């Protein structure tokens, strides 16, 4: 593997000194880029794009050609794990992801097998190794997975949900059944992420997109508990370096202290949290990633500049901050505005690292 030339992102996650705040964007390889749309059209559909290692590599690299970013993130989907469990993932226009065979009974959950990441998920591993090779050490590669709770919401509901009625019914009516599912998912995700590291991922992120839908105590029982299990089982060193782990619960501002106790290296923040307040609460334990509202990218370059300045000022001096959006970039954002965002981070952050 080529020697890493830019380790700013990894250093910030480990709270080591950096010359400026590193920056990347969630969903940086995505529909806001015309070159992504062209490659997706070539693939035919979303999952065909994910399953073609060369095209997955191409879309991973596309934002790096446009912008001076400090990390690449594997192009894939959080639902690859349940798909590999045999649920029959498909995408319905205007409806998002759906499963042909939801796991909404104890019998269906008992039948689930833990997928072999080098077999049923081998296409992801081939993409990881291809991307790592083609990056040529320019920036580190982030591997990722959905959290057990978030994956379970799709599996039990049969797809996207706003009310989470089925899975919450299971949580309170048949908690042992849900725990059985979450336990299998935690084991599956641990194997999946460790295989990503073995194939070249240099940092890991767990996306808990729907943890914020839970009550205070239910979050600890059904989400955090299983992310903790994963963190405990992850490979934390590879290629002579530490492999940092970031946890991101959308809507998780209430639980930063509990999340920081898991032993992860960093927490992702959504835009509802003041990053300076988050630093005062947990900055002694973990680095922080975030957290500009993605909708700010619809604003003028001047407004974007102002928002970046405010977040940097709130965090203050020193390392331990990776600049990002508070969630994925919207598909209708002008790529020029994303460029304004990244340039503003470069321009404004150096003074906080002298």
Swiss-Prot record:
Residues reported in the UniProt entry to bind substrate: 27-31, 77, 154, 209, 327
Gene3D superfamilies tied to this protein: 3.20.20.210
Keywords on record: Cytoplasm, Decarboxylase, Lyase, Porphyrin biosynthesis
Pathway in which this enzyme or protein is active: Porphyrin-containing compound metabolism; protoporphyrin-IX biosynthesis; coproporphyrinogen-III from 5-aminolevulinate: step 4/4
Catalytic activity: uroporphyrinogen III + 4 H(+) = coproporphyrinogen III + 4 CO2
GO cellular component, as recorded: cytosol
Annotated site residue numbers, Transition state stabilizer: 77
Domain of life: Bacteria
Enzyme class label: lyase
UniProt protein name: Uroporphyrinogen decarboxylase
Pfam family, one: URO-D
GO biological process: protoporphyrinogen IX biosynthetic process from glutamate
Family, per entry: Belongs to the uroporphyrinogen decarboxylase family.
SUPFAM superfamilies referenced in this protein's UniProt entry, alphabetically: UROD/MetE-like
Quaternary state and interactors: Homodimer.
Free-text function comment from the UniProt entry: Catalyzes the decarboxylation of four acetate groups of uroporphyrinogen-III to yield coproporphyrinogen-III.
Main location: cytoplasm
């Amino acid at each position: 593997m080529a020697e890493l030339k830019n380790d700013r992102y990894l250093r910030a996650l480990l709270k080591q000194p950096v010359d400026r705040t590193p920056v990347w964007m969630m969903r940086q390889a995505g529909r806001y880029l015309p070159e992504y749309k062209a490659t997706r059209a070539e693939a035919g559909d979303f999952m065909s794009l994910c399953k073609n290692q060369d095209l997955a590599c191409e879309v991973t690299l596309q934002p790096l050609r446009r912008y001076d970013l400090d990390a690449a993130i594997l192009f894939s989907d959080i639902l690859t794990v349940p798909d590999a469990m045999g649920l029959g993932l498909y995408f319905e226009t205007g409806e998002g992801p759906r499963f042909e065979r939801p796991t909404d009974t104890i019998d269906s959950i008992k039948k689930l097998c833990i997928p072999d990441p080098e077999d049923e998920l081998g296409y992801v591993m081939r993409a990881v190794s291809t991307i790592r090779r083609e990056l040529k050490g320019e920036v580190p590669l982030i591997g990722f997975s959905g959290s057990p709770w978030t994956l379970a919401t799709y599996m039990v509901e049969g797809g996207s949900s706003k009310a989470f009625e089925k899975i919450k019914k299971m949580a309170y009516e048949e908690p042992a059944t849900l725990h059985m599912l979450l336990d299998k998912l935690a084991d599956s995700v641990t194997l999946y992420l460790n295989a990503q590291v073995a194939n070249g991922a240099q940092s890991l992120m767990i996306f808990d997109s729907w943890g914020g839908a839970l009550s205070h105590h239910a979050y600890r029982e059904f989400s955090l508990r299983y992310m903790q299990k994963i963190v405990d089982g992850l490979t934390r060193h590879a290629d002579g370096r530490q492999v940092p782990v970031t946890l991101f619960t959308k809507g998780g501002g209430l639980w930063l202290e509990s999340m920081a106790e898991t032993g992860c290296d960093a927490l992702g923040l959504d835009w509802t949290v003041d990053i300076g307040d988050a630093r005062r609460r947990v900055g002694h334990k973990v680095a922080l990633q975030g957290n500009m509202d993605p909708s700010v990218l619809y604003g003028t370059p001047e407004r974007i500049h102002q928002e970046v300045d405010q977040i940097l000022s709130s965090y203050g001096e020193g390392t331990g901050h990776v600049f990002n959006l508070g969630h994925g970039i919207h598909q209708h954002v002008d790529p020029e505005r994303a460029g304004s965002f990244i340039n503003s981070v470069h321009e404004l952050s150096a003074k906080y690292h002298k």
